[in-house]
Amino acid sequence: MGHTINNKTAIVTGASKGVGYATVKLLSESGYKVIAVSRDLSKVSGLVGDNVEVYQMDITNANEIKKFYDKYKDITLDLLVNNAGGGSAPTSIINETMDNFRRAYDINVSGPMYLSQLFVPCMKKSDSATIIFISSLGGKFPYRSGGNYTNAKRGMMALVDTMRLEFPEYGIKVTEICPGTIDTQEEKRDIALTAEDMAESIRWVASLPKHVNINHIEINHILSGK
């Protein structure tokens, strides 16, 4: 098998579907020991195997994040994929609610920040540690009715930029991947990336030499007449 990795450990959030699910499968097939994190264990039970264990956690709940860290605080962590994300249904700013806006930030910014912060000691033990944030082109190019989602993804971009300045002193690389439309269970499009496309990108970033950091990746489907 190509791209085989031995004795590496990864954490993937939002593992119950789409990009997270595909990433857990690909990394485990490549030799990673993967901890797949999801709010709903019933949706990740099919991932359990020799290289995969699952953990139930809500990324918006600080107490649950801390309990998760306490369980795994002694591991050497090589890769953290902050994939859990999302927002409420599309709405205009004039109709936005504080609860939805705050929850979008907790999912996309506050939760991933806290998770990354806690696991720094585990990643410092790795020969080459990487944190990957799955963002969206919507954070760079806001659109009407993007509301809490596009604003939260813009906040994630600022978080990643700050971490990229601060985390190299701990030997940790930080990358943000911004896809366009992804073909998922919720969103079926003829012109869209697949979850597997994203998983391949994540594995590639994680495989780079420790002195090479990819700051930011924008990925789109190629429009073709063929």
Task: List each language-model region with its residue ranges.
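A short, exposed helix-loop element centered on a Lys and neighboring polar residues
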Residues: 116-117, 161
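Active-site-adjacent segment of SDR/Rossmann-fold oxidoreductases
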Residues: 141, 162-172
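C-terminal helical subdomain
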Residues: 176-177, 189-226
